[in-house]
């Protein structure tokens, strides 16, 4: 990340990032990151990203991309193959030449060459361009944030609790910590992308390949294992159905006293499947009265606080009153900062 930022600042380049989609190499809130002051580019350089005018792509990734005839993206191994804004160059530029070199290892050479060719006139032009990009990006950032807040405010006091409120109330509690969002966020609304700042390579570890179930808790506990020795905390916004595949990792987190906060997105269903079944019932004219069979978790409801307690983990819930959410999150963050894992069971909106 340091070298990518250095190159961008040396050239005053407008940049984009995949920070809200998974591990990345450019901070989301950097002044040069965003739409910029102009969409007209002389040159588009991709660093381990396909389809720029010239992309520096490692041999292993390049081989995967060349073999990806079905455009499946290798379950997230090859970033940007089919994701909007990443599969093509900036300004939707057409694909260009791929140079098979390691991007990170090549950056010092590029930086050295930029410095060699730098003149005072070029430096003044770069400073002017960078300033214009920074102003435009700040304006775009504020507009996007205000729009997101307006949209999410609509369900602020809803019961069951809106997933946006979980992310919104959690952010002030962790924003000054060295945090990792270790769990996928797509099924819980992906609100981190709009409300949080992703400025480190590990800010968000991304999603599970192919939407696979049972990934969230084990992946988050694994991240917490690495985070412990680094003084970091891991955040796990945990889907309820997903946890039931491998709940034993809660014992692992407790046994090793891992710094992980698990907040249950407990909609009492495998809601992706429930919505699909209800949709198909409508398409086939069968009625939706039996759509819950095999897709919901009721009769009985699962008490995840008690589940965590069985594995020795502290926790609380189920929380149904949104007014009580903030205090619970505060207790959870405090516990994790002491090195003790914590689980908060929150009864949530479906998505």
Go through the PLM ranges and name each one.
Residues 20-21, 49-53, 77, 186-188, ...:
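Short glycine-rich anion-binding loops that position phosphate/pyrophosphate groups of nucleotides
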Residues 136-227:
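Active-site diphosphate/adenylate-binding microenvironment
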Residues 38, 107-108, 191-350:
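Thiamine diphosphate
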Residues 15-18, 46-47, 99-101, 180-185, ...:
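General beta-strand structural signal in soluble alpha/beta enzymes
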Residues 1-16:
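Redox- and metal-dependent alpha/beta enzyme cores, enriched for Fe-S-associated oxidoreductases
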Residues 1-3, 26-30, 55-59, 82-87, ...:
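Short acidic, glycine/serine/threonine-rich loops at helix termini
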Residues 18-134:
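Glycine-rich, acidic loop regions that bind phosphate or pyrophosphate groups
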Residues 5-6, 36, 168, 251:
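Alpha-helical segments flanking ligand/cofactor-binding loops in enzyme cores
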């Amino acid at each position: 990340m340091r070298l990518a930022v250095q190159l961008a600042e040396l050239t005053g380049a407008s940049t984009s990032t995949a920070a809200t989609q998974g591990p990345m190499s450019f901070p989301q809130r950097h002044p040069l990151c965003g739409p910029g002051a102009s969409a007209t580019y002389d040159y588009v350089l991709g660093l381990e990203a396909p389809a720029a005018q010239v992309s520096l792509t490692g041999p292993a990734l390049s081989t995967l991309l060349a073999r990806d005839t079905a455009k499946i993206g290798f379950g997230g191994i090859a970033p940007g193959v089919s994701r909007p804004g990443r599969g093509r160059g900036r300004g939707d530029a057409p694909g260009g030449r791929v140079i098979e070199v390691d991007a990170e290892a090549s950056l010092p050479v590029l930086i050295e060459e930029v410095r060699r060719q730098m003149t005072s006139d070029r430096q003044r032009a770069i400073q002017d361009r960078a300033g214009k990009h920074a102003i435009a990006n700040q304006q775009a950032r504020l507009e996007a944030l205000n729009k997101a807040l307006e949209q999410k405010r609509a369900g602020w006091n809803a019961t069951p609790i809106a997933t946006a409120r979980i992310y919104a109330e959690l952010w002030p509690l962790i924003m000054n910590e060295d945090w990792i969002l270790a769990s996928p966020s797509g099924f819980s609304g992906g609100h981190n992308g709009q409300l949080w700042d992703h400025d480190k390579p590990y800010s968000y570890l991304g999603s599970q390949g192919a939407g696979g179930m049972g990934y969230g808790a084990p992946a988050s506990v694994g991240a917490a294992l690495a985070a412990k020795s680094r003084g970091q905390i891991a955040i796990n916004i945990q889907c309820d159905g997903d946890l039931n595949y491998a709940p034993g990792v809660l014992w692992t987190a407790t046994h090793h006293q891992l710094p992980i906060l698990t907040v249950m997105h407990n909609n009492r269903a495998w809601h992706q499947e429930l919505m699909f079944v209800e949709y198909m019932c409508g398409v086939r004219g069968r009625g939706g009265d039996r759509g819950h069979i095999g897709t919901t978790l009721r009769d009985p409801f699962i008490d995840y606080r008690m589940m965590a307690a069985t594995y020795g983990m502290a926790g609380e819930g189920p929380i149904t009153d949104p007014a009580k959410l903030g205090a619970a999150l505060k207790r959870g963050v405090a516990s994790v900062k002491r090195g003790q894992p914590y689980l908060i069971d929150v009864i949530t909106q479906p998505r």
